[in-house]
UniProtKB/Swiss-Prot annotation:
InterPro entries: Isoprenoid_synthase_dom_sf, Polyprenyl_synt, Polyprenyl_synt_CS. Isopentenyl diphosphate binds at residues 53, 56, 85, 102. This is Geranylgeranyl pyrophosphate synthase subD. It is an enzyme of class 2 (transferase). Mg(2+) 3 binds at residue 222. It catalyses: isopentenyl diphosphate + dimethylallyl diphosphate = (2E)-geranyl diphosphate + diphosphate; isopentenyl diphosphate + (2E)-geranyl diphosphate = (2E,6E)-farnesyl diphosphate + diphosphate; isopentenyl diphosphate + (2E,6E)-farnesyl diphosphate = (2E,6E,10E)-geranylgeranyl diphosphate + diphosphate. The gene is subD. PANTHER family: GERANYLGERANYL PYROPHOSPHATE SYNTHASE, PYROPHOSPHATE SYNTHETASE ATMG, PUTATIVE (AFU_ORTHOLOGUE AFUA_8G02400)-RELATED. Mg(2+) 1 binds at residues 92, 96. GO terms for biological process: alcohol biosynthetic process; mycotoxin biosynthetic process; terpenoid biosynthetic process. Keywords: Magnesium, Metal-binding, Transferase. The lineage of its organism: Eukaryota, Fungi, Dikarya, Ascomycota, Pezizomycotina. It comes from Metarhizium robertsii (strain ARSEF 23 / ATCC MYA-3075) (Metarhizium anisopliae (strain ARSEF 23)). Mg(2+) 2 binds at residues 92, 96. Geranylgeranyl pyrophosphate synthase; part of the gene cluster that mediates the biosynthesis of the immunosuppressants subglutinols, meroterpenoids consisting of an alpha-pyrone (4-hydroxy-5,6-dimethyl-2-pyrone) moiety attached to a decalin core fused to a five-membered cyclic ether carrying a prenylside chain. The first step of the pathway is the synthesis of the alpha-pyrone moiety by the polyketide synthase subA via condensation of one acetyl-CoA starter unit with 3 malonyl-CoA units and 2 methylations. Belongs to the FPP/GGPP synthase family.
Amino acid sequence: MSPSAPNTNELNSPVLETQPLAGDAALLHSSIAAGYEEIIRAPFDYLLNLPGKDVRSKMISAFNEWLCIPADKLEVIKRIVMLLHNASLLIDDIQDSSKLRRGLPVSHHIFGVPQTINAANYAYFLAQQELPKLGDPKAFEIYTEELLSLHRGQGMDIYWREASKCPTEEEYFSMVSHKTGGLFRLAIRLMQLASDKNWFVFHTRDFVPLVNVLGVIFQIRDDYLNLQSHAYTVNKGFGEDLTEGKYSFPIIHSIRSDPTNIQLSSILKQRTTDVDVKLFAVECIKATGSFEHCKEKIAELVAEARQLIKEMGNSVPGSAEAVDRVLDLIGLEPESS
């Protein structure tokens, strides 16, 4: 018989048939797996215990001033967003070859890449497991739509970096809307779904446009701080976006402001860790007025967000002050942060 030919006796053998676990056997296997829960979650829990600003949780609490969600459902939504946000950070750090997260070594440098990827994927499904608690099957639809959106945005960002292709600002805004805006939208859409004011929200006002603007402000500010903030240097390392080869907002503006100067584009391709080279790149970005452009764009978007908040405050019962405070948290003049 040929070595590649199937053994019919083996194919028909009942020993090879997969049988469902039942009774004590099922309980035993479940108990064994449960004993590994802490190990499986270790990369995730390590990241979770690092200090952070918890902007997304504060945003959820702020919007609840308008939406009045029952406390149990509000905690479910916060947990879903927390799980997804931290899972995405685990994957981001691997894809970006990051070394620091919040001032300490990234998870995959401690637990290894395979275990960290598994922990991140595990967290995605822990989040999905929470959805039935919201009591509406549409929650699954929202969850799927926004996770697909998040991965589309991440794919665009990775493609530009790996292909050394500088996007336009319009393409950048589209990417941010998908990637950064995805979790913001997921939170608010689930909140609208669970709100005691559901009838009012769906028939008169939609909070998603405001959340989209907040997401863009958050990302541009983050891009600015990556290259200009001392605190960011302590937490993530100096000019990490340059080492990563990332087309961030100030870098895109700088390259497109002077297409004949290939110095900045060339530095991005090098994935440099040399501080002197990165300092030179920062000077190139300054020379094209790109940091000022960032601040102007942030100010423009903050004004747009405040107008949307004002309109919401005039038409939706509840206080707008909490949302204003979240805007202050993510939209202050970058140099003061």
